[in-house]
Amino acid sequence: MENDVLSVEIAEHGAELTKLYNKKTGTDLLWDAEPKFWKRHSPVLFPNVGKTYKNTVKINGTQYPTSQHGFARDSEFKCIHAGKETSTFLLTSTEEMKEVYPFDFELFITYTLEKNVLHVKWEVKNPSDETIYFTIGAHPAFRFAKNEEGKTDYILKFPGKDELKYCLINLKEMAPDPEELHEMKLNEETYPLTEELFENDALIFDNTQIEEAWICHKDGTPYVGVKSEGFPSYGIWSVKDAPFVCLEPWMGRCDNIGFDKEISEKPGINKVESGETFEKEYQIVVTI
């Protein structure tokens, strides 16, 4: 898809955004999936964001195995509409999926270009007679503008904020403790990017603290941002020495340490009643 400002490519595998090109500046903004650092571009996280505790989930009293970030990112979607500025992809539940996630669902993902903005809309339809539960999230990785640049050439900006609080993954338990919070004190809404920032994996922000985040050049010039109104959780992540940063709005997130209750009792879980549809959208904004 393309317009006068942006050119994008989306794969049917995972309905994953694989290219985001700024035609005005000649810049590829999306990570190229070089496996040395990370083999993905912008996976869709469904039906679970992150890991469930001990890699299992309890649904109606039965334990099911789970994989990190769910199966949608490795599933084949069907492109049901391909236009010049908007495309829609569909993933429908199968019997194989029900072995790990025993719900009927239809997941629609629509990408729409509007000038310098890429809108990404999720719809989860429930065609069954029972309530379904899930979390869903975005994971776009934004590469730095020049090959020789690193994290210290950029800063993060959070408009309207002067302080944020986040929790980290306990690397022994592979789950976060939401009671163990860290403060991020901002300087004029900004915070420096460093390699050390991601030593404990992702930074996890809860309580709808972040609804807009930007990667900016060190002089404060905006580079690329993500707007995500009403998303309760947010992840910021990178890999050591990798020339990219992920800005990740999440509708729900990984399990906390020790969570072993029914999926319906999980904090931040989304539910869709029989015949109803869940809808949510975020936007990637490119500076031109």
Please state what every model-predicted region is:
Residues N48-G50, G70-S75, P102-E106, E149, ...:
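Short solvent-exposed loop/turn micro-motifs enriched in small/polar/acidic residues
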Residues M1-K58, Q63-T66, T208-G230, F278-I288:
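Beta-strand-rich N-terminal accessory domains
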